[in-house]
């Protein structure tokens, strides 16, 4: 159940950022890919999906993420969503269609 929600969030965000899932789950610091991953963390934690599940789902996609990175990404995404109405609209739309 949580895996399907995670997959929906990941696909939706990748689509919005015009990147592939492979790009989203690569070890890169490119800003738009980092933003995409951080928004994924924010959506999952707000759902709520346990951090241990998020970590496992990311690992299943080839991306090793630490708990501190999840926390930092969540906080960064929260600031981004609070300051940019376009990101706020995007995550709201994704959340409204996640069932």
Predicted regions and their residues:
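DNA major-groove recognition helix of helix-turn-helix
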Residues: 45, 74, 78-81
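Short, basic interhelical loop/turn and adjoining N-cap
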Residues: 50-52, 56-72
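General nucleic-acid-binding
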Residues: 1-11
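Conserved catalytic core of nucleotide polymerization and phosphodiester-bond processing enzymes
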Residues: 10, 19, 39-40, 55, ...
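Short, amphipathic alpha-helical "recognition" segments used to contact nucleic acids or chromatin
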Residues: 33-49
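Short, Lys/Arg-enriched anionic-surface-contact patches
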Residues: 11-37, 65
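Short Lys/Arg-enriched helix C-cap and helix-to-coil transition segments
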Residues: 80-99
């Amino acid at each position: 159940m949580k895996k399907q929600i995670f997959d929906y969030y990941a696909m939706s965000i990748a689509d919005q950022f015009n990147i592939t899932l492979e790009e989203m789950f690569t070890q890169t610091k490119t800003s738009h890919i980092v933003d995409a991953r951080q928004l994924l963390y924010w959506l999952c934690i707000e759902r709520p999906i346990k951090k241990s599940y998020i970590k496992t789902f990311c690992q299943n996609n080839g991306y090793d993420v630490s708990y501190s990175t999840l926390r930092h990404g969540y906080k960064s995404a929260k600031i981004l969503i609070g300051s940019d109405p376009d990101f706020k609209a995007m995550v709201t739309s994704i959340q409204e269609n996640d069932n």
